[in-house]
């Protein structure tokens, strides 16, 4: 598979760092959105149900 490599290790590490940061931000936004949605309208009922 070495003939398929067209990026250097340094480029791969740079891409990985950018990808990891973007993924972390994406997950963080999703978590905040879920917390806000839960505060607005919980999707798992309590003991008394949704009533």
Curated annotation (Swiss-Prot):
The keyword Ribonucleoprotein does not apply. It comes from the Bacteria. The chain crosses the membrane at residues 18-40. It is a single-pass type II membrane protein. GO terms for molecular function: bacteriochlorophyll binding; electron transporter, transferring electrons within the cyclic electron transport pathway of photosynthesis activity; metal ion binding. Residues 41-51 are periplasmic. Gene3D superfamilies: 1.20.5.250. A bacteriochlorophyll binds at residues 16, 34. The core complex is formed by different alpha and beta chains, binding bacteriochlorophyll molecules, and arranged most probably in tetrameric structures disposed around the reaction center. The non-pigmented gamma chains may constitute additional components. Belongs to the antenna complex beta subunit family. This is Light-harvesting protein B800/850/890 beta-2 chain. It comes from Halorhodospira halophila (strain DSM 244 / SL1) (Ectothiorhodospira halophila (strain DSM 244 / SL1)).
């Amino acid at each position: 598979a070495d003939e398929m490599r067209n990026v250097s290790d340094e480029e791969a590490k740079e891409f990985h760092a950018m990808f990891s940061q973007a993924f972390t931000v994406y997950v963080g936004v999703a978590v905040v959105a879920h917390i806000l949605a839960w505060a607005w309208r919980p999707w798992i009922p309590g003991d008394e149900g949704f009533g």
